[in-house]
Amino acid sequence: VRPNPTAQNVMDGAKLAKENCCDFVISLGGGSVMDCGKCIALMMTNDGDLWDYSLSKQGGKKIPQNPAAPNICITTSAGTGSEVNAAAIISRDDLEEKTLFLRPSMYPTISIVDSDLMLSVPPK
């Protein structure tokens, strides 16, 4: 997952998860990875394109019919808070949009903060 994940990152991940009959997502990384994982979990259980559910200017403004799949967030960075909230920031380069996705079912099912995974993170 690249920094500032894209809708295409999400759709690729959701497609892979569906093709392999995955039941849940494990998001191991920083805020971008966890945001992408939350939206992958949402699209694993809902039809269409992620932007169908975007409230942005060019989004479809649809309400997801199903809750997101379970998502285990394991943070490797400090300060994003993505492991404890239901929000995700996703970009769509072709529309030049970057927007918030926020659904109660996108709260991580389990969040893990392991200090051993953050030994290389700068203190500030």
Segments predicted by a language model, with ranges:
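N-terminal small/polar loop signature for handling phosphorylated ligands or for N-terminal nucleophile
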Residues: V1-D49
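A glycine/threonine-rich phosphate-anchoring loop and its flanking beta-alpha core
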Residues: D47-K124
